[in-house]
Every structure is written in structure tokens, then in C-alpha cells.
A protein has these predicted regions:
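Adenine-nucleotide phosphate-binding core of ATP-dependent small-molecule kinases
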Residues: 56-78
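Intrinsically disordered or highly flexible coil/loop and linker segments, enriched in small
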Residues: 54-55, 83
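Amphipathic alpha-helical blocks
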Residues: 49-51
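Oxyanion-binding/catalytic loops of NTP- or PPi-dependent enzymes
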Residues: 1-47, 60-63, 82-171
């Protein structure tokens, strides 16, 4: 599901594929890229977490923060799980996210109805998914994450099933 949001003329919000299709028809209605304030600057809302940036909906008189937009994406993802109630979530974030951006991400999770949120840096999550904590994979590892618009890396040491993070870096 693309992290894309659109708002129609009545103010209804779409998230995901429907919003992405709206964006193809009219970039002003949907975004990873919404206009900031009165300028004509378009940016991805993930990149402005914790900056007090307001995104202006050009076809409706409405403003949203990055946290509010992120919460809409999380609510939609949560709705995909049928007949299950859960209140905890693990979210991956870019390696370069600041403490304020991480705090804003946790706030977005709360807005989406999650009571508990854990954050993992994207290259760390990738190394866990690959199974680097397995004992037969002892050694020093460089893990790259070529994510949607970011390039992150982590330098890890794995010994006896324990992963130690030396450094993470990204853009």
C-alpha cells in the first residue's frame, strides 16, 4: 500500500491505492507530496515529522500535520487486520530520524489508536528479518536499506545470537 493520501472536495480522506490513483489524475489532491503552507513546495510528509509543517489541501480548506497524515496511513493499515484487536505496533524509521522525529512517529501511532509503539531503525529491522541473530551468522555485518527515497546503513556485530549495533547512518 503506498503511503499516499488524498482529500476529495467534501473533505473525505483516501489512503493507499485510491489516493495514489487520485494523485496520478491531479497531484493537488493526493500526496506523498502536498503543498506546504502558501508556497508551491511539494514534499513527502514523512520527511517533515516533528517540524510543525502544515500541509494545505488545495481543493478543500484544510490543513494537516505530518503526524496527522501518518496517523491516517497507520489507521488504514490497522483496518486491514480483520476481526483482531491489538494495541501495539512496531514501526521502522529511517536511520537519520532525530529524537523529535521519533517522538512524532510515536504520537502518530497514538493518534491511530495504538497504546504502545516501538521503533526500529530500518537497517536494523532488515538485519533482523534476514536472521542475523542466528548463531551461525557470527561476525561483523554491514546492512544496507535501499528504502523508498532513503539510503540507510548499519554496522553490526553478531556473536552467539546477540546483535550489537556499532553505527547507523542514512540520508
Amino acid at each position: 500500500m503506498p503511503s499516499c493520501i488524498s482529500v476529495n472536495k467534501k473533505g473525505s480522506i483516501k489512503v493507499g491505492d485510491g489516493a495514489y490513483n487520485d494523485m496520478k489524475q491531479d497531484k493537488r489532491r493526493a500526496t506523498k507530496t502536498w503543498r506546504i503552507g502558501a508556497s508551491n513546495t511539494y514534499v513527502e510528509f514523512k520527511r517533515t515529522m516533528a517540524t510543525n509543517t502544515n500541509y494545505v489541501c488545495t481543493n478543500k480548506n484544510c490543513n494537516y500535520t505530518s503526524e496527522e497524515l501518518s496517523a491516517e496511513v497507520l489507521k488504514t493499515l490497522k483496518s486491514f487486520v480483520t476481526d483482531e484487536t491489538f494495541s501495539s505496533v512496531v514501526i521502522t524509521v529511517p536511520a537519520k530520524f532525530t529524537v523529535n522525529q521519533k517522538t512524532a512517529t510515536i504520537e502518530a501511532a497514538k493518534m491511530a489508536g495504538f497504546k504502545h509503539c516501538e521503533l526500529l531503525q530500518e537497517p536494523i529491522a532488515a538485519s533482523m528479518a534476514y536472521g542475523l541473530t542466528a548463531e551461525e551468522k557470527n561476525g561483523i555485518w554491514m546492512v544496507f536499506d535501499f528504502g523508498g527515497g532513503t539510503f540507510d546503513a548499519a554496522l553490526l556485530k553478531v556473536a552467539d545470537g546477540i546483535m550489537q549495533v556499532f553505527e547507523t547512518e542514512g540520508d
